[in-house]
Amino acid sequence: ERIAGVLLVGYAVASLLAAALSVAMLASGANLRSIVAFLLGGLDGASWPRVIAAAAPILAATLALAARGRPLAAFLLGDEGAMHLGIDVRRERGIAIALASLATAAAVALAGLVGFVGLVVPHLVRLAVGPDPRAVLPLSALGGALLLLLADSAARTAGLPVGVITALIGAPLLLTLLRRARAG
């Protein structure tokens, strides 16, 4: 648990600093703009054919994860608790990781690397509705979509990649959530 906290703090700080560095790079040269735009993500290059192509694996993975609600909920009991309920922990964990990776790969192919949406939103949803993945997964998807739309609107207004906005929102929120979790 402590190692995970250290890793998440490191990710938050690194992403915030990378966003600041990327803004400086964007201002300095046109050749770097396309690389940095992908690294920080955005919806400006999205088209209906690309959205439909990405939607298929995302929807398939999401529905498959939703169908695995019982094993995912059993993980809340820890590995031993899940095993006592008859869950093949290694198999189910592998399936969950593969499905999450499929959805993530499709989303990154569409929008680039947009940080913090998948870290912060599920934590906030979990605080609001509890840990049951049958509620957390769909609400996180809706909350993530809403955050991305709001961040994209702000990014377009400011002329920045959406990843800069999500880092500016997500890093402080993640650090606050981690500090609260550590304190209590």
Where are these regions (language model features)?
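Alpha-helical transmembrane segments in inner-membrane proteins
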Residues: E1-G184
